[in-house]
Each structure stands twice: as structure tokens, then as C-alpha cells.
From Swiss-Prot:
One term under GO cellular component: cytoplasm
Protein name: Ribose-phosphate pyrophosphokinase
Family, as annotated: Belongs to the ribose-phosphate pyrophosphokinase family. Class I subfamily.
Entry keywords, A to Z: ATP-binding, Cytoplasm, Kinase, Magnesium, Metal-binding, Nucleotide biosynthesis, Nucleotide-binding, Transferase
Enzyme class: transferase
Length: 313
């Protein structure tokens, strides 16, 4: 079989795989990925893949362990079926927050996942907005680390005027937020969280001028959404005209959607690296943008051995 692209998908996000395939002018290749009655995962690639350039679209989001196991079994099946190269397209990299030893006698889970990928035969990884960029160093294979910035920047430019300030919800996100502020030529503010005395509630202080401006909180992911929602309240208390939020990965676990619904946020913009649950889909404040065109462009460049560096913005 000639060296052609084949797009595959597990059960994590088939809609994203369909969108990517549509941008590439093809359909997702057929694979049977299901569970046995005892919970074991079964994978069967239904068509010949010998000599093909295979891309598996599978964010390792909730249920993270099922989706991770589906991915590694699909890779093994494709490798044994003689695919020429297998690329794991993992828009959301589960376990990314466990990227270092934060306490004695704990694993570095993000490294373990990387070792699993390489052990089963992944030859390249395509991911987006890693929680910790140094995860790229856990791999001994090429990692193309894309950013959702082009998609989010386009939305911000379209929806908001010039009276905007970009806000980092914590000190750790300053570099990301500064990059957005620079591209948009806007101001930058930071929310500093600290306890002034032991046993006191955490206080939130705004560093920067937000008074009378549209404040846009930026983060790489929203899990329980507590930081974002509390940040919105603090910004309004400091004189912001209104508050919006943007993030790449809508993890949205536990009380997240309820918090967003009841928060001071006017809107909460996310991308489709992770599929939204029904509760999130029905929340009028949450808007989802697609990164499928960006991923499709990267896949095409990788297949054609073209440079992907222009996408790293």
C-alpha cells in the first residue's frame, strides 16, 4: 500500500477525529474499539494498514485510564499490522499535572505515560498546550507541541474591543498570558493568591490595572473552575467592567459547570481538545471553539515531511 495518511480514533473524542479527517478530505479509518463484559478493552483494525502513515486521535481525558489503554492497544495493533509510522495525536495529555516528584515516594506519572507510548511503538506525538512544557523531554521521540493560541486570539479579536486587559489567574500562568497580551497589544494583570497569616483564608490581590476594562482570564485548563470563578469575583471587586475567561482544556470535573453558571463570568471560552459533557453543553456561558483545522494542518505537514514550526505560536 502506498504511503498514505490513515486517521484512527478511539472512543475518547470521535467527533474531533471526524473534523480532522474532513479537513484532510478523508474519513476516519474503521477500527473496532470496545469493552468486554469484564471491562477489558478490545481493539481490531478493520482494514489493511501496511506501509501507511497512521495517526490516532485520542485525548486521554476522563475516563483517563480507559482512554489511555485504548490508545496504547491501538498503537500495538497498528504496529503489528505493519503501519509505517504511528503518531499519537493527544490534544489533551492526561497525567500532565503529575510531572515531578511533589512529595516523597510518589511517581512521576507524566513520565510513565511517555514511557508507555514509546514502549508500544509510538514514533511521534502531537499534543496541544501541555500543562508543563518540560513533558516533551520525557520522550525520546519527536514531540510536536502545538498551542491553541491562534484559535483563541482570533475569537478575542473578533468579540472584544480595545479596552481589554489579559489576566493570569496565578503566578504560574504569567508567561502564557503575557504572550497573549503582547499579540493583542493589551495590558497585563496577575492575580496573586497568598495567606498573610497562618490559618487565615487565602487572599487574592490584583497586580495591574483592570479598572473600567474588560478582563479576560487565561489558563491552560479548567478542572473544578474554582480558581477562574474566584478570580472573576476579585477582578470585579477591583473595578473591572466585565470578566470573561478562555482556556484550552475544558476538564470541568466535579462542581465546575455549576460554579461557572453561578459565577461573575460573562462567558467562558474553551476548545474541543476534550469533548463537553451534556451539562457543559447546556451552560449558556460556555462556548467551544474547534482546533481541528490546526491539528489537521500539523498532520498534513508531518506526513509531507514539511516544517511544523510555523504552527508553534
Amino acid at each position: 500500500m502506498p504511503n498514505i495518511i490513515k486517521i484512527f480514533s478511539g472512543n475518547a473524542h470521535p467527533q474531533l477525529a471526524d473534523e480532522i479527517a474532513a479537513h484532510l478530505g478523508m474519513q476516519v479509518s474503521e477500527a473496532d474499539v470496545r469493552k468486554f463484559s469484564d471491562g477489558e478493552i478490545f481493539v481490531e483494525i478493520k482494514k489493511n494498514v501496511r506501509g501507511t502513515d497512521a495517526f490516532i486521535v485520542q485525548p486521554t481525558c476522563t475516563p483517563v485510564n480507559d482512554n489511555l489503554m485504548e490508545l496504547v492497544l491501538m498503537v500495538d495493533a497498528l504496529r503489528r499490522a505493519s503501519a509505517r509510522r504511528i503518531t499519537a495525536v493527544v490534544p489533551y495529555y492526561g497525567y500532565a499535572r503529575q510531572d515531578r516528584k511533589s512529595a516523597p515516594r510518589v511517581p512521576i506519572s507524566a513520565k510513565v505515560v511517555a514511557e508507555m507510548f514509546m514502549a508500544v511503538g509510538v514514533r511521534r506525538v502531537l499534543c496541544m498546550d501541555l500543562h508543563a512544557g518540560q513533558i516533551q523531554g520525557f520522550f525520546n521521540i519527536p514531540v510536536d507541541h502545538l498551542y491553541a493560541a491562534p484559535v483563541l486570539l482570533k475569537h478575542i479579536k473578533k468579540e472584544f474591543g480595545e479596552d481589554v486587559v489579559m489576566v493570569s489567574p496565578d503566578a504560574g500562568g504569567v508567561e502564557r498570558t503575557r504572550a497573549f497580551a503582547k499579540r493583542l497589544n493589551t495590558g497585563l494583570a496577575i492575580i496573586d493568591k497568598r495567606r498573610d497569616r497562618p490559618n487565615e483564608c487565602e487572599a487574592m490581590h490584583v497586580i495591574g490595572d483592570v479598572r473600567g476594562k474588560v478582563a479576560i482570564l487565561m489558563d491552560d485548563m479548567a478542572d473544578t473552575a474554582g480558581t477562574i470563578c474566584n478570580g472573576a469575583k476579585t477582578l470585579l471587586e477591583n473595578g473591572a467592567k466585565e470578566v470573561h475567561a478562555c482556556c484550552t482544556h475544558p476538564v470541568l470535573s466535579g462542581p465546575a459547570v455549576e460554579r461557572i453558571t453561578n459565577s461573575d463570568l460573562k462567558s467562558f471560552v474553551v476548545t474541543n481538545t476534550i469533548p463537553l459533557g451534556e451539562e457543559a453543553k447546556n451552560c449558556p456561558k460556555i462556548k467551544q471553539l474547534s482546533v481541528s483545522a490546526l491539528l489537521a494542518d500539523a498532520i498534513e505537514r508531518i506526513h509531507n515531511e514539511d516544517s511544523v514550526s510555523s504552527l508553534f505560536v
